[in-house]
Amino acid sequence: MELQLRDHTEGKLQPSQERLAEKALAQAAERLDVPEQAEMSLTFVLNPEIRELNRDYRGIDRATDVISFAIEDDDDLANLPAEIRAELPVELGDLVISIDKVTEQALFLNHSADRELGYLLVHGFLHLNGYDHEEPADEEKMFTLQEEILDGLGLSR
């Protein structure tokens, strides 16, 4: 999977956090059998930027931890021959994570910043791949898978 990583944190994002992001998303993609030609972007921001996004796209005027922007399937692609569709990149969408919230929530929840970052990465990635937690059965399925992936990364609770 191709990952486009952007850092808008004014130096707050650590190289170890970038490596964790790449590893966590690669492991989650492997677990979900995401095609190799899949593409997504991950942008790390500070609270003011994610607050603006949250306000503009969700109508909630406060900072949040992660926002996922899934790319919907294009019905026009369904009309293409299967051989051509197989060659096209699969665009999953975009994740935006507040590095400020990673730190704040790790302190509040009394676990490591790596655990919090891993959680937000995997949680957002699952949303990009169609998982949600609106219904109890869906929540159980998503959260179980999420914890299995985090356990595989050594980021157990």
Swiss-Prot record:
It holds the Pfam family YbeY. Gene3D superfamilies: Metalloproteases ('zincins'), catalytic domain. Coiled coil: none annotated. Zn(2+) binds at residues 123, 127, 133. SUPFAM superfamilies: Metalloproteases ('zincins'), catalytic domain. Binds 1 zinc ion. It comes from the Bacteria. GO terms for cellular component: cytoplasm. One of its GO terms (molecular function) is zinc ion binding. It is an enzyme of class 3 (hydrolase). Belongs to the endoribonuclease YbeY family. This is Endoribonuclease YbeY.
